[in-house]
């Protein structure tokens, strides 16, 4: 082996070897235990960023470790290739999305290979290819036939100048990102999949996901939002209309003083027809997009409709108000308002001087003071007629039962979860396989006409979708009847909801999935991705798996057994203020910094002399120009160093602070491992280790070696605390570096230790370990070498170091045989002169002994 560690010489050769040998290519093998490790597939944006590197390094470490345990390991990769950014980039670069996407895929694929990730490249998927989305379209038509798909009008962002639908991220301060025209809300027909039919399953099955982060499961529970309550029907004065509301607090029903309805509710629209002021208010509400998350903090606005509902139990007339905080697409688009016991209702009632009626007593049994705020706690009912004196639960049930008995109420379980709107009015996505025939009938595209192919050779004008702009594209026939194809495309979450299953059989042409392959590999054993996907992607991912199961395509209930959500990668951020007061962000690579003795940044300038403001550590992003290019780091230090730093600098699920000094430290460590191996091999062949004739010093070193193997095995396999595993190997390396190399046994022990160290580091730094394994004479390639097994006998200690205290103060340390009794330890302590002087002529009143660790003598 060469004397110096040169990653540039090693890494290309090793990667070529893997490619030629097809090391990571796998097929189903019933004789071996399978392990499917999957990292969330990347969007081909053009360049890998450090977040990608962290995600894929974690996945690769787990995959290589599991392979060393003798398992049949599948680790695939692909590209989530549809989506809006490609359209923007195509317009900007005067090209079409397809060539831009395919160029990016090629570039990023090479970057992944440079980092040494062990993927089965034969299974590579690009979701924009017809051979992939063909099966998605086919499955959608099957869902339609099962009644799981429907079309309804839903609000979108509409630019009246460009006559196009805008994604939320294309609306800047209420205006179109391209032409700055004020954006309107427009109702258009869209396709939905009934995820709500699976709400109960999605909720209950979270309890089976024992190896998913609790945080993710809690977020999903909240998103599904199961509640038990009552649907209540109000009559409307002088109208045939009925008004339906849902409440989770029927115990407060006697405190309803008004009803609030959404601007788009039929009663609002009916009243607005003869009330111009109300019509203006309704228009304002409907053109203001409000996310549910903003409801709590936004200003509550409303206007009386002039209509009244009748309280089903008291007969009171309740004013009906149109309000901006009621969403038409959530529940019934109407809420009963109990301002005495709901903060939002109280705020609205106070603003518009509406009655506030208390019906729940305070905790001390007194009437609540509602002058400053609502009392939202549950308690005893009063001011509620026949229900006075009932506690919350009894009041809930009594009022619910009464409403049901009168035929104006129905107990109901409700979900916050909404059906999944899968229509996107964009071009770069999979066409939705539906056709509207001449007579207006809507039918699915026949199977023999699938896939509905998206044309890739198009001209982007930045305004309309090429398939919407081309009337010829939509023309088709079904069973000889002319019709028009749907020109909307699928939400890209569709593609990423089932890709994991297609990886099991990417070339399979006889169906969506090959059942034998899918059921061999699935469920995924380990899924790795960011916490930001906790709700959307991970919910659809779970939902789709249940759809596949119910279609007979897979036989498991959940797609992934274990989930690891890696933390973000942070870096220093610097800026200076430009001439117009704007912040100009400077890359940390271009910042020249001064630090104090604690390593804190006290001054920074850029190459042009601008004094920089240090904005602290923040997530690597284009907006703050603080991303570090992985390729630059790989060229400078080697892929193994970058991988090692990524896994060592922080626990996998925590944020990682990028520090180049830490990267340099990782590089120095690999150089030390290389140097120790070089010095060892330079001395020639090694004789076998004779365990029976080891000295105490050699036994101690071998004990440390096998304790390290045991710890690293547990840290990597069970605990997934990769940073502590690396720290343990580093600690062992320090001991090996100091170990004598005088005798044959010393060298034989060093050989055992280095072969173990190289295997423990292999999942993290595979290239250098591949070379070191060869240099050390390891059997075969390290890629097929088994994980080291800790020798239980080696870890048994012949002796123990016992701390001796007198009255709780440490007075000495003694070495005793591992099997020494308490009496023997006391006798040995009495012989220790540092201890003996504190016992001279004094009576020992009490002895506290922790076997093999501590002896405390209480004297006096």
Curated annotation (Swiss-Prot):
Subcellular location: Cytoplasm
Superkingdom to which the source organism belongs: Bacteria
Keyword Cytoplasm set for record: yes
Motif mapping: 'HIGH' region: 42-52
Motif 'KMSKS' region in this chain: 619-623
Binding residues annotated for ATP, in chain numbering: 622
Keywords from the UniProt entry: Aminoacyl-tRNA synthetase, ATP-binding, Cytoplasm, Ligase, Nucleotide-binding, Protein biosynthesis
GO cellular component: cytosol
Any one of the GO BP annotations: leucyl-tRNA aminoacylation
InterPro entries, alphabetized: aa-tRNA-synth_I_CS, aa-tRNA-synth_Ia, Leu-tRNA-ligase, Leu_tRNA-synth_edit, M/V/L/I-tRNA-synth_anticd-bd, Methionyl/Leucyl_tRNA_Synth, Rossmann-like_a/b/a_fold, tRNAsynth_Ia_anticodon-bd
One MF annotation (Gene Ontology) recorded for this entry: leucine-tRNA ligase activity
EC number of the protein: 6.1.1.4
Aminoacyl-tRNA synthetase among keywords: yes
Gene3D superfamilies named among the record's database cross-references: 2.20.28.290, 3.10.20.590, HUPs, Isoleucyl-tRNA Synthetase, Domain 1, Valyl/Leucyl/Isoleucyl-tRNA synthetase, editing domain
Family statement: Belongs to the class-I aminoacyl-tRNA synthetase family.
Protein name: Leucine--tRNA ligase
